[in-house]
Amino acid sequence: SYFLAQNGHDVTIIDAMPKLGGMLRYGIPEYRLPKEILQKEIDLIAKMGVKMETNTKVGVDVSFESIKNKYDAVLMTIGAWSSIGLHCKGDDTPGVMGGIDFLEKIAKSKTINLGESVAVVGGGNVAMDACRTAVRMGAKKVYNIYRRTIKEMPADEMEIREAQEEGVRFENLTNPIGIIPGEDGRVSKIELQVMKLGEPDERGRRRPVPVEGQTKVLDVDTVIIAIGQQVDSKLFDGIEKTRKNSLVYDPETYMTATKGVFACGDCGNDKVSIAVESIADARKAADSI
């Protein structure tokens, strides 16, 4: 919106959330990105004349077809908000939640009872954000569960180091195989398969393989799954999608196969980006429009 407004376009943001900012507001914890700084950026965009429609969900409050008909160009920046599940026994037990869902609830100041012991599954930055947020919420034990070693973790080294300094317990070379409820029906334990590194995969990373007969169990009150996100694109009919349900767009022009509909950031071409990369994408897409 900022770059399009700079180029002299009339711009309208349509957002399902009550406040603007997307993943910057609801997916990045306060300690990493203070909301006061984000709000100043949004206020600047508003002063540039950008119209802002919040609490407006496509497919519920407005149809995608009507948006396409109303505007000369539509830029899809919907991100990847749907957490990927574990697909193991007990993964639907009360007390199991997605990493982005957890961070979003915290950003919206919703009450969450984590209990004293939390397991966070995953090795990326969202997993580190969830671990460090759980520590800040008062959890006495926070475990990070990752199926490879700490050297293979995709999270930034600084995030891993600071999580260690804050007391997060790293259970590397383990993979969840079951979540066990207690008498109250909520999460009570997580069962882990001990892993070892095998031969490299197609990307050169050594594959984690189970060590036969070796498992371990941790007592936990909450399990947070942060092994990746998917794009919720089912409401956008007529736009070509990848096998993973991400939007397909031309990497040079950022336009989809639907004329006048563009996409960028994590919602397209199965990309996984950090914030600054998505912003760079947005600048290129705005120039193309």
Predicted regions and their residues:
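Feature captures the FAD/FMN-dependent oxidoreductase FAD-binding
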Residues: 39-88, 178-191, 196-199, 222, ...
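Residue-level detector of alpha-helix initiation sites
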Residues: 19, 124-126, 230, 268-269
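Extended interfacial segments that mediate partner engagement and assembly in macromolecular machines
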Residues: 1-12, 24
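Rossmann-like dinucleotide-binding cores of NAD(P)H-dependent redox enzymes
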Residues: 13, 17-48, 52, 104-106, ...
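Redox-cofactor binding/interface segments in oxidoreductases and associated redox assembly factors
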Residues: 76-77, 98, 120, 225
